[in-house]
Protein backbone atom coordinates (compact mmCIF):
# COMPACT_ATOMS: atom_id res chain seq x y z
CA UNK A 1 0.00 0.00 0.00
CA UNK A 2 0.96 3.60 -0.30
CA UNK A 3 1.90 5.88 2.51
CA UNK A 4 0.15 8.86 4.04
CA UNK A 5 0.99 12.46 4.79
CA UNK A 6 4.37 13.06 6.45
CA UNK A 7 5.20 9.36 6.43
CA UNK A 8 8.81 8.56 5.62
CA UNK A 9 9.35 7.50 2.02
CA UNK A 10 12.15 6.72 -0.41
CA UNK A 11 10.44 7.50 -3.71
CA UNK A 12 7.33 9.08 -5.19
CA UNK A 13 5.83 5.65 -5.89
CA UNK A 14 5.49 5.06 -2.15
CA UNK A 15 3.14 8.01 -1.71
CA UNK A 16 -0.50 8.15 -2.83
CA UNK A 17 -0.80 9.18 -6.46
CA UNK A 18 -3.21 12.10 -6.12
CA UNK A 19 -5.45 13.82 -3.59
CA UNK A 20 -7.96 16.61 -3.59
CA UNK A 21 -6.46 19.47 -1.57
CA UNK A 22 -8.62 22.57 -1.12
CA UNK A 23 -10.69 21.63 -4.17
CA UNK A 24 -7.70 21.08 -6.45
CA UNK A 25 -6.23 17.76 -7.54
CA UNK A 26 -2.64 17.55 -6.37
CA UNK A 27 0.06 15.15 -7.47
CA UNK A 28 1.66 13.62 -4.41
CA UNK A 29 5.37 13.22 -4.12
CA UNK A 30 8.14 12.19 -1.78
CA UNK A 31 9.68 15.45 -0.58
CA UNK A 32 13.06 15.59 1.11
CA UNK A 33 13.66 18.12 3.84
CA UNK A 34 16.92 19.89 4.41
CA UNK A 35 19.35 19.24 7.23
CA UNK A 36 18.92 15.47 7.34
CA UNK A 37 15.20 15.64 8.13
CA UNK A 38 14.58 12.76 5.74
CA UNK A 39 11.89 12.40 3.09
CA UNK A 40 8.14 12.29 3.57
CA UNK A 41 4.98 12.23 1.48
CA UNK A 42 3.74 15.70 0.60
CA UNK A 43 -0.03 15.51 1.22
CA UNK A 44 -2.45 13.48 3.28
CA UNK A 45 -3.80 10.42 1.46
CA UNK A 46 -7.20 9.90 3.02
CA UNK A 47 -8.44 6.57 1.68
CA UNK A 48 -7.40 7.06 -1.94
CA UNK A 49 -4.30 5.54 -3.38
From Swiss-Prot:
This is U3-plectoxin-Pt1a. The keyword Calcium does not apply. It is found in: Secreted. Expressed by the venom gland. The lineage of its organism: Eukaryota, Metazoa, Ecdysozoa, Arthropoda, Chelicerata. One of its GO terms (molecular function) is toxin activity. The presence of a 'disulfide through disulfide knot' structurally defines this protein as a knottin. GO terms for cellular component: extracellular region. Keywords: Disulfide bond, Knottin, Neurotoxin, Secreted, Toxin. Potent toxin that may paralyze and/or kill insect pests such as H.virescens (lepidoptera), S.exigua (beet armyworm) and M.sexta (tobacco hornworm). Disulfide bonds join 2-16, 9-30, 15-41, 32-39, 45-49. It comes from the Eukaryota. Its main location: secreted.
Amino acid sequence: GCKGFLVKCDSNSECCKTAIVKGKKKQLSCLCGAWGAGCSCSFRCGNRC
